[in-house]
């Protein structure tokens, strides 16, 4: 809740060329000032940040991705314009959610998602054994630790989870996520217990992926990974050309 993220450098990547004739402008909602129609992003921010939205008859669910991976894939596409999905997936192997939880979707399924623009990503909590107990040290994206404890406690009260004797939330500043599940005895199969909890609580979640965006042609459509990157490369080439033309015009005015 109180984590501070310093995004100044990243914001510069999105805004640095704004005053250099790179994009078109339009009036804002009340006509009091003009605002850019798009930002002259120097990186494919749509893939990096991810987004979600819904409209009549369509929806968009794009997960976030790793900055280095996306940039490397884009450079590969520039060097090899005919690169296929498999070649791009050497660099972008899966989405990159802001958590240490594990993505359990197979690499083959992930490639199919990037190829078709549709699918789902499965993610489960990361845990380890400690003094005979289970310690959860990372939860799936947007999963609340208190809600997970409530779900487990409800099963204990309903006598559907006889293997567990105690729950503790030991999360603190040093360990943002540390949920302890104490088994009833040392004879409890922890792997079997966790398999049950993965199936019945939010310790395992599925995230829908739908790469439905408005393309360079101004029309919405589901796009594959390579189509998204190619659209951005096309946009970036237009942006760079407009920037150079703007600078040339300024120089000619001074001569």
Regions found by a protein language model. Name each.
Residues 2-5, 9-13, 18-21, 25, ...:
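C-terminal interaction appendages of subunits in large macromolecular complexes
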Residues 14-42:
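P-loop NTPase nucleotide-binding/switch module
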Residues 32-48, 53-56, 61:
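Long insertion/accessory domains within large nucleic-acid-processing enzymes
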């Amino acid at each position: 809740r109180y984590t501070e993220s310093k995004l100044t450098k990243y914001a510069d990547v999105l805004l640095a060329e704004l005053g250099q004739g790179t994009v078109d402008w339009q009036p804002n909602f009340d006509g009091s000032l003009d605002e850019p129609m798009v930002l002259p992003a120097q990186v494919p921010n749509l893939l990096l940040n991810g987004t979600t939205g819904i409209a009549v008859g369509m929806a968009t669910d794009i997960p976030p991705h790793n900055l280095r991976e996306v940039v490397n894939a884009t450079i590969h596409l520039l060097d090899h314009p005919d690169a296929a999905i498999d070649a791009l997936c050497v660099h972008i192997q899966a989405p990159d959610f802001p958590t240490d939880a594990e993505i359990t979707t197979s690499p083959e399924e992930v490639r199919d998602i990037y190829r078709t623009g549709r699918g789902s990503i499965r993610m489960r909590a990361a845990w380890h054994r400690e003094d005979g107990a289970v310690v959860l040290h990372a939860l799936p994206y947007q999963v609340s630790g208190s809600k997970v404890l409530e779900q487990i406690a409800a099963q204990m009260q309903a006598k559907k989870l006889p293997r567990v004797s105690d729950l503790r939330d030991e999360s603190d500043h040093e360990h943002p996520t540390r949920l302890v599940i104490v088994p009833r005895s040392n004879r409890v199969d922890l792997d079997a217990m966790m398999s049950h909890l993965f199936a019945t609580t939010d310790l395992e979640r599925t995230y829908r992926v739908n790469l439905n965006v408005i393309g360079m042609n101004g029309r919405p459509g589901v796009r594959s990974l390579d189509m998204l990157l190619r659209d951005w490369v096309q946009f970036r080439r237009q942006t760079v050309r407009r920037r150079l033309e703007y600078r040339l015009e300024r120089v000619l005015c001074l001569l």
